Amino acid sequence: MRGRKLDGSWADFDAFEWGGPYCEGNAWHYNWSVFHDVQGLIDLTGGDERFVAKIDSVFALPGIVKYGTYGTKIHEMLEMELAKMGQYAQGNQPIQHMIYLYSYAGQPWKTQYWIRQVMDRLYNSSENGYPGDEDQGGMSSWYVLSALGIYSVCPGTVSYTHLRAHETGAYL
């Protein structure tokens, strides 16, 4: 995802730069924001293999932060750095669904692996148990739905991605 200028031309671009066309994030976070047409995004990326490789790169890249239009480090930047998961920023909503996109490209085991990593490494039962601010229940709903093995990649729809639950039972 890349911003455009008012005249329709492409804006200068640095995928690690925060701000500008990206609210509290960068291009690595917003690249996956085609909730309504994941298959179209996969096709645009070059197919399943290239799509999966691009998701893999989010975790493999260094946690580089360029302040961009913010001019200083904001808490979302710090949270991403502290997580030590490359450019993956669980502490901010725009990328939280990305892990589930592995399943759309035929690799649900990677979805399972990274969900477990995020749940085990970034959440705990202390007063600081979320990897960022709660933002209208975003952190807790991601955790609960992921623990139950369901997730709505496209908000506002009744379509859910189903995976193996991480919990053996739940009362709803």
What are these regions (language model features)?
Residues 1-93, 134:
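Catalytic cores of carbohydrate-active enzymes
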Residues 34-46, 97-106, 145-150:
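Well-ordered alpha-helical scaffold segments within catalytic/enzyme domains
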Residues 42-53, 103-115, 155:
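Structural helix-adjacent loops and short alpha-helical linkers that scaffold large soluble proteins
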Residues 69-72, 97, 108-121:
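A glycine- and small/hydrophobic-rich beta-loop-beta segment
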Residues 107-118, 135-160:
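Catalytic cores of secreted or luminal carbohydrate-active enzymes
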Residues 127-131:
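Acidic, glycine-enriched catalytic cores built around paired aspartates
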Residues 161-168:
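Conserved small/polar residues in nucleotide/adenosyl-binding loops
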